[in-house]
Structure formats: structure tokens, C-alpha cells
Amino acid sequence: MGLLIPMSMPLSGAALRAGALEVVVFGGHLLLYPTGVCQEKVTTRPPATRPPVLLLHGFSDNRSVFVLLRRALGAGGRHVEAYNYSPFTLDLRVTARHLARRVEELCERTGQERVDLVGHSLGGLVGRYYVQRLGGDTRVRTLVTLGTPHSGTRVAPFMDAHPLIRQIRPDSEVLTELAAPAPGCATRCVAFWSEFDAIMTPAGTARIEHPDLCVENVQVTGIGHLALAAHPAVIAAVRRTLEGPGLAAVTGSDTASVA
């Protein structure tokens, strides 16, 4: 989950602070993890006035990783739910199809035509596959990804026996599908990435590089992989992103930063 800083990364003061913060966040997440194991209870609520937000956790994780982000979005008046996909999933594409059904159910229940998705790590890739390959751009207004291996990651090669891990390697079949043309994709994509994200190897692989997508890549400084889902600066930036326009006027990869 990103506890260690690779030896190739300079041990600057910023890197050490990011590593220390990651340890603190990891400890807090361990305490909260049991609270997110079960699916949340879905309650009937009045129709939403804005697109609901659906949160997607990462590999071997659960909805507890979003406790702070969810609280902040809810305080801003958004209807927020989390989708716990199976920790035993072996194929990202199957999970994306399950997500499609979950989105349809959420739209029907809230009376909204579109939703916003926020995915941490693998969850962002599940959301992107749904948007690009399963027609999800007709339902997803904005896709926000936090530390997602859009170009694949080479971390932990000893885990290659796991089919899902092989799918997030550079040039995998899934990533090749996502690199294919996606003309007319109607979803705005915002990718948050950090140079101190030890899970994303090489650094910058969490950027989205695709000529057909409306993309903004946001660099976050001094934050590790797990902290991307919990740091106040990132949470504030995600909240602003979801309050912004549904689709920018131009496509391409632009870069912003969060200090």
C-alpha cells in the first residue's frame, strides 16, 4: 500500500516527510479497515439535485479508505456512496461491468442521468475502463482518479502471478485497450498523481495520456499513495473539481498542481 520509498528515489526532506505521512495514514487505515468490509446499507433518499458521487477503492482495499473524502463531499451537499467490489476479483473488466450495473441502479434511485466517479489506485482504472470501453461516458460526468496506474506500474514484480496485477503492468491487454482511440468520449477526466507515490513506478504513470480524452493531470507534491485519498489538500481539490464544469472546451492533457 505504499509504505516504502524506493531506493532510486532521492531521500530528500520532502521524500522523508511523505514517507512518514504515509506510515501515519497506513496506521489509521488499518484501524478503519474492518468498518468498510461489508457493503454499505443503501437507503432511499429524495432525488438528488446534483449528480451523485460514487467512490471506488483500490486493490485489496475497501470503502473505509474514503472516510475523510466522503465526509467532506457530504458536507458540501453531495449524495455520496461507495462501491465495494470483491477483493477476490481476477479481472478488472468483469469488475467494470459490475460497476456499470451499480451506476444504473444509482441513477434510477437518485433520479439523476449522470454521476461523478472517484477512484483510488485500481478503482480509478476500473472507472476508466467503464467510461472508455463500456459506454460509461454517457453516465459519468467527471472521473477523478487518485494514484491510478494509467500507464501501468512495475512495482512488486513478485506479485505477477496474480491475474489482476498482470492487468496493471505496462502494455497489458487491458492497458492496450485503454490506449485505443476513444473519439467523442463525453467524460471529463482528472488524474491526481504524486512524485512520491511509491506504488506508481515509474513516477508519472498515474497521469492520463490519451489524445481523445478531456484530461487534466494534477501533480500533488509531498504525498504518498495512500495519502492521496486522505490528505486535506487533495480532498479540497477533488471537491473543487466536482463542483467545476462538466466538460472542458478542449481535449488533451493539461497539467496543474496541488502543493
PLM region spans:
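Post-His helix in hydrolase/transferase enzymes
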Residues: 229-243
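Serine-dependent carboxylesterase/thioesterase catalytic core
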Residues: 54-59, 63-64, 68, 74-186, ...
